[in-house]
Regions:
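Non-catalytic helical/linker scaffolds that mediate oligomerization, partner binding
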Residues: 1-484
Length: 484
């Protein structure tokens, strides 16, 4: 069984329950919705169908974030090298061959002569040769075609747009209403952009978790403060590969993953992981290697975009990614391990998590069980990227869904208030039934002696057979609930 989590993008054009169920059984852990391509009605349909399939599937919704786009065109416009174009910030006017209008009125304030304007994910490049104040004059650098409402990137420049659009604010309120689990905020440039979303969530007493999408140089430069302000990070390599030199992407990816592990926060690698499978039933060797390398770098999760949202082989894409992940996890080298413990800093719960992981290697422990109200202990354990699964007992379904982004964590819900001993033995029994444990295997239990808010205080290690053979004399620290 794979330990790397899979996020799959789903469109309202293909979101029936049978389709979602197939992806779920194939290995999908979280459904992602792209608000750039979904109406409110479509979002509601996706959420209702996902919840009908299983309350255990996480749901993530994107914001559009601060972006610049072209305006409408009557028909696609063809450009040749050397064509000269006037560019205005006039969102209310359509574009033509000689005049391109953009959605951002103040574009001339933020762009200088010599900058490249990259249209449609970098497909068309225009270099600015003059800035008159009211308009830019640019020269086309490559032959290409420009359609309506295409993306515009200006590598190396700060575009002074607000962190949230009006549509973003409406979609955040919709996410709160629908009790969605994650908001993936696009084009995050600093902690202030994360705070803009968090302020809305706080105002409405929502516990939705924020995933910050790193898509430009500013986000890379400010990654430490962004990680601190976020629940998790998505390395969105599409726009990132336009905004920064593409040869820098692997190194940026590796460094961000390492920083997230140090912070004990989930990290997702996204974009073009199995892009070929939008149209073909098999991936390229390079795509297989890309997925494996993300796992060798120690990512928590991988994301599929067009492969599952609009591709011809969505189920096969999830199945393929799951198979590659499972094999890559077996092939990982310890030389790439990242120690989440800060040198010179001793934290009790992290020390105990490290001890439990060490036990899997030195004492042959086959699995770790933990429980808690926040999932922090499970995320601490996930940061060590241990070889065996972590079973996290969750006391609410939402926590279970939040942990669907954490490597190696199997979250299950325990709604009934039962004793520590009863909960632990039930968890061991479940692991045995699922084939993770044999009678002679050792199991570790990481928990606290003082109930909710009391912190992690002990590690229990025992043989499965011994636990059940001595059920009357076997004891654990009490959580205040007596065995019946």
């Amino acid at each position: 069984m794979k330990q790397t989590k899979i996020v799959a993008s789903i469109s309202d054009r293909r979101c029936d329950q049978d389709f979602i169920r197939k992806l779920f059984f194939a290995g999908m852990n979280v459904v992602r919705m792209n608000t750039a391509h979904a109406s409110e009605e479509g979002i509601r349909t996706i959420v209702n169908n996902v919840r009908a399939v299983s309350p255990h599937i996480g749901i993530l919704i994107d914001t559009k974030g601060p972006e610049v786009r072209t305006t409408g065109v009557k028909e696609p416009i063809h450009y040749n090298i050397g064509d000269v174009v006037k560019i205005f910030g006039r969102p209310e006017m359509d574009s033509s061959h000689d005049i391109v209008n953009l959605s951002y009125p103040n574009i001339t304030d933020d762009v200088k002569v010599g900058d490249d304007l990259l249209f449609d994910d970098g497909e068309l490049d225009m270099k600015v040769i003059e800035n008159t104040g009211p308009m830019l004059v640019a020269q086309v650098q490559n032959e290409g075609t420009l359609g309506a409402h295409k993306s515009v990137n200006v590598p190396g420049e700060h575009i002074d747009l607000p962190a949230l659009t009006e549509k973003d604010c409406r979609n955040i309120l919709l996410a709160i209403e629908l009790d969605i689990d994650f908001i993936a905020h696009s084009f995050v440039r600093s902690a202030a952009d994360v705070k803009a979303v968090q302020d809305i969530l706080d105002e409405h007493h929502s516990d939705i978790k924020i995933i910050s999408k790193i898509e430009n140089q500013e986000g890379v430069d400010n990654i430490d403060e962004i990680i601190e302000a976020s629940y998790g990070i998505m390395i969105a390599r599409g726009d990132l590969g336009i905004e920064v030199p593409i040869e820098k992407i692997p190194g940026i990816q590796r460094r961000i993953i390492a920083k997230c592990i140090k912070a004990k926060k989930p990290v997702i690698v996204a974009t073009q992981m199995l892009h070929t499978m939008i149209h073909n039933p098999r991936p390229t060797r390079a795509e297989v290697t890309d997925i494996a390398n993300a796992i060798f770098y120690r990512t928590d999760a991988l994301m599929l975009s067009g492969e599952t949202a609009s591709g011809k082989y969505p189920l096969e894409a999830v199945q393929t990614m799951a198979r590659i992940a499972e094999q890559a996890e077996k092939d990982k080298s310890p030389v790439n391990d990242i120690d989440p413990m800060e040198e010179g800093y001793i934290d009790q719960k992290l020390f105990l998590a490290h001890a439990a992981i060490e036990a899997t290697q030195k004492l042959g422990v086959k699995g770790i069980i933990t429980d808690g109200e926040t999932g922090q202990t499970a995320r601490d354990l996930a940061a060590f990227r241990g070889p065996n699964p972590v079973l996290a007992i969750c006391y609410k379904e939402k926590l279970q869904r939040w942990l669907n982004l954490s490597y190696g964590v199997i979250p299950i819900v325990q709604k009934d208030q039962i004793s520590t001993k009863a909960m632990f033995t039930a968890a061991v029994r479940m692991l045995r039934q699922k084939g993770y444990l044999e009678a002679e295997d050792k199991i570790a239990y990481l928990s606290g002696s003082f109930g909710e808010g009391g912190g992690t205080t002990f590690v229990e290690i025992n043989k499965v057979r011994k636990i059940f053979d001595n059920s009357y004399s076997f004891n654990l620290p009490s959580n205040g609930i007596e065995d019946k």
